[in-house]
Structures are given as C-alpha cells and as structure tokens.
Amino acid sequence: MIRLANEKDIEQINNLLFQVHKVHSDARPDLFKAGSKKYTNEELKEIIKDKEKPIFVYEIDKKIEGYAFCILINHNNENSLCDYKSMYIDDLCVDKNSRGKGIGKKLFDYVLEYAKKLGCYNLTLNVWGGNDIAMQFYKNIGLKIQKIGMEKIL
C-alpha cells in the first residue's frame, strides 16, 4: 500500500535515509559524511506536515519498504521561464532487501499520477554521478535527461 507518511514512520524512514546516504557517501566520500543522513527527526516532522512536500511510503505488513520525498514547485512570473507547476522527486528509495520487486516503479507511478492530478507539467529528479543503478532504473522507466550538472574538483 502506498500512503502519505506520518510521524510514526520516522524511525523506518530513517533506516532508508541511511541506506541512500551510504550509496552517496560510498560514491562521493569527498562530499558526503559517512554514517549520516539527510534530515534530522525534527526536520522530518516539519516536512511531513508540509502539504507542498509530500512523502509517500510503500508499506507491507507495517514495514516501510520504500519512500518518495516530493516537492511541489510553482514556476510563476520568472523572467526566463513559462509559468508551470512541477513535481520534483527529492529522494526515492527502496529498502536494499526489497529491490527488484517493482516497488520503486510503483512509487514512481504513484507520484506521477499524483502530479497529474495536481496539474503538473512535468516530474523531475536528480541523480548523483556514480549512482549507476538509479540512473539505469530511471532510464528504464522512461525518464530523459533534462539537464546535467558538472564539476571540476579544485
């Protein structure tokens, strides 16, 4: 079942946040601190309350097997962009023990339908270089490159 997250889910969400962070810190130890996570519990509580930042969880038998952190973005009255609404997936994770079962695709499809209902023009996300599994997953489900961020280490 996919549903909106609530405060009772924070502990299980944290377990998944650590998994995502490990992928990032393994790929880019120069940028990501090992053993940490993206949000504090207080930050998670605030995000859960924010209707513009829905967190959807995939739950089986009271265990959260995956999540999608989303952000609704309204582009209005910007100098160079047309007015449009966009749904941004800030983070999508499936528990490492549950991957390959279609959970990520189900979460993505759920967010896609949610974004359509809100009248969004597009659904976007970012993938860190080195996260080849995620990159391939997103390509396999039909996402196309919108823009590429590049860097030169000094």
How would you describe each model-predicted region?
Residues 124-134, 151-154:
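Conserved beta-strand-loop-alpha-helix junction that forms the acyl-donor binding cleft
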Residues 105, 109, 117, 129-147:
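Conserved active-site alpha-helix within GNAT-family acetyltransferase domains
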Residues 74, 92-99:
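A short, internal acetyl-CoA/4′-phosphopantetheine-binding micro-motif in the GNAT/acyltransferase core
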Residues 42-57, 88:
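A short helix-loop-beta-strand connector motif used in the catalytic cores of GNAT acetyltransferases and
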Residues 115-126:
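Conserved GNAT acetyl-CoA-binding A-motif
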Residues 1-15, 24:
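A short beta-loop-alpha structural element at the N-terminal edge
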Residues 22-44:
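Conserved GNAT-fold acetyl-CoA-binding loop/helix
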Residues 57, 63-72, 93:
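Conserved beta-strand in the GNAT
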